[in-house]
Amino acid sequence: MSSNQSYVFYRQELNKTLWEVPDRYQNLTPVGSGAYGSVCSSFDTRTALRIAVKKLSRPFQSIIHAKRTYRELRLLKHMKHENVIGLLDVFSPAKSFEEFNDVYLVTHLMGADLNNIVKCQKLTDDHVQFLIYQILRGLKYIHSAGIIHRDLKPSNLAVNEDCELKILDFGLARHTDEEMTGYVATRWYRAPEIMLNWMHYNQTVDIWSVGCIMAELLTGRTLFPGTDHIDQLKLILRLVGTPEPELLQKISSEAARNYIQSLPYMPKMNFEDVFLGANPQAVDLLEKMLVLDTDKRITAAEALAHSYFAQYHDPDDEPIAEPYDQSFESRELDIEEWKRLTYEEVTCFVPPPLDSEEMES
């Protein structure tokens, strides 16, 4: 919005929400809405790209909302990688800080997500290699910035017709207990240590999710479709076996330790039997991802070098991110201060250069 002064805005009501956007963005069509905002597809007349415009819902309603708005903008501005959604534009119709109440974010419009792909077709092993390689390539970048996704699942992975993939909605997920309750996909892909508050978690929570997604791509079935937290844990332990004493000692929650010790002993299943007919290298990688002990779980960078990705792995083309300053996370500010920081981020935004091979869906 650094060039906000050159924007001419127009107004349109969509689904009882007033949208006020620059006239370069035409044909606004609602495509979805959630707790944090609503999204329209649109045509960018300057770049001839189909884009997504997200209007944040009540961005400065409370301190929590205001900090989340600032966090989302900071994260999106930082991400500059082929396999991660990035920011094409950010704007507000406000002409001054005093008028500043609405924030609109512009990203690529992604056609389908991995959920659609899995439902529609049986994937070949080559497809699985390429898709999982791209997820890990994006994760290596995100993790190198010190960011954890926390909510990787098929619906957060956008894919176009050429099988090119981008990771969406990262780093924002701080789900409430309510959202994690019952038969919900939000939890099926969650690492046990984060789902059950076992201990301080690290970036490999995302690797557990990739393992769950990869298993689903190979078999066409959800790996751990638990009906609740306890059922989910039982499904996990049935596959990977009862935790070793060494791991139990690392679980800081005494209640969790006692509960696990009360369960009957379960041996680890043979992954080759579970994933019968799958590429042996795929099975080997799954065994390294679906490890209960986070200290022993493979990292994104290590996984990229696994033999399963031999035809795609290129150490010179798996970039890492610039350092990302997250010191704001520990700051205690009021709404006006978060709003001021957000306003500064909006006004100093510089659009990315247009890539000749822009990813369209």
From Swiss-Prot:
CDD domains: STKc_p38alpha. GO terms for biological process: intracellular signal transduction; p38MAPK cascade; positive regulation of myoblast differentiation; positive regulation of myoblast fusion; positive regulation of myotube differentiation; regulation of transcription by RNA polymerase II. Keywords: ATP-binding, Kinase, Nucleotide-binding, Phosphoprotein, Serine/threonine-protein kinase, Stress response, Transcription, Transcription regulation, Transferase. Pfam families: Pkinase (PF00069). InterPro entries: Kinase-like_dom_sf, MAP_kinase, MAP_kinase_CS, MAPK14, MAPK_p38-like, Prot_kinase_dom, Protein_kinase_ATP_BS. A motif (TXY) lies at residues 181-183. It catalyses: L-seryl-[protein] + ATP = O-phospho-L-seryl-[protein] + ADP + H(+); L-threonyl-[protein] + ATP = O-phospho-L-threonyl-[protein] + ADP + H(+). Gene3D superfamilies: Phosphorylase Kinase, domain 1, Transferase(Phosphotransferase) domain 1. One of its GO terms (cellular component) is nucleus. Its cofactor is Mg(2+). Its EC number is 2.7.11.24. The modification Phosphotyrosine is found at residue 183. The modification Phosphothreonine is found at residue 181. Serine/threonine kinase which acts as an essential component of the MAP kinase signal transduction pathway. mapk14a is one of the four p38 MAPKs which play an important role in the cascades of cellular responses evoked by extracellular stimuli such as pro-inflammatory cytokines or physical stress leading to direct activation of transcription factors. Accordingly, p38 MAPKs phosphorylate a broad range of proteins and it has been estimated that they may have approximately 200 to 300 substrates each. The TXY motif contains the threonine and tyrosine residues whose phosphorylation activates the MAP kinases. This is Mitogen-activated protein kinase 14. It comes from Xenopus laevis (African clawed frog).
